[in-house]
A protein has these predicted regions:
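N-terminal membrane-anchoring/stem segments of glycan-assembly enzymes
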Residues: 1-48
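Short aromatic/hydrophobic "clamp" motif used to bind/position activated sugar donors
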Residues: 137
Length: 186
């Protein structure tokens, strides 16, 4: 026992207590500030809905015809409703153009843009951003689907802290049983 202590004294007396102390402090801070955080969210939600800024949702993609409709449906279920959907077709050679044209005519998407020559996702995103009219821009993949309150959760940090300039999200794979690649991402 003494040889273990003499060899690993730093671990037992410095590192482990430091780790556990910090862990307990973080947990304690979360528990004591939970009401404050919820109050900040409620105030931010009030200001968000009072201002009601337009959000531009950019959806660049190539050969995403089979996914676009599901993504548009998940956006239709959002709790935050003031948004425009800009789909940029990056030179698809499947039936994406037909589906997006139908969605545009039916009013489900605001803009449908098509690049005849493939330029890649960045070029499609930049092209779509030129058409964006919103105060905020959200970039989505065509095969994405969102929780009902995702747009609201994306926007709230801008109203909680005025220094926030960008927000990222936690992406979870929902179709993790479909392909080997999707199961590896999950």
């Amino acid at each position: 026992l003494s040889s273990i202590l003499s060899t690993y004294w730093f671990l037992f007396f410095i590192e482990m207590p430091r780790y556990y102390l910090l862990e307990y402090l973080v947990i304690f801070n979360r528990l004591t500030n939970k009401n404050k955080i919820e109050k900040e969210k409620e105030v931010a939600r009030f200001y968000l809905y009072r201002e009601n800024p337009l959000v531009s949702i950019l959806v660049p993609g190539k050969n995403e015809g089979s996914h676009i409709f599901k993504m548009v449906n998940s956006l239709a279920e959002q709790t935050y409703r003031n948004y425009e959907i800009i789909v940029v077709d990056d030179g698809s050679d499947d039936y994406t153009k037909l589906i997006c044209t139908d969605l545009y005519r039916a009013g489900y998407i605001t803009h449908y843009l098509r690049l005849e020559d493939r330029g890649g996702k960045a070029a499609a995103s930049n092209y779509g951003a030129q058409m964006a009219k919103g105060k905020y821009i959200v970039c989505l993949d065509a095969d994405s689907s969102l929780d009902r309150d995702a747009l609201e959760k994306i926007l709230l940090p801008f109203y909680i802290d005025g220094m926030v300039k960008g927000v990222g999200g936690c992406v979870k794979v929902r179709n993790n049983k479909d392909t080997i690649c999707s199961s590896l991402q999950a």
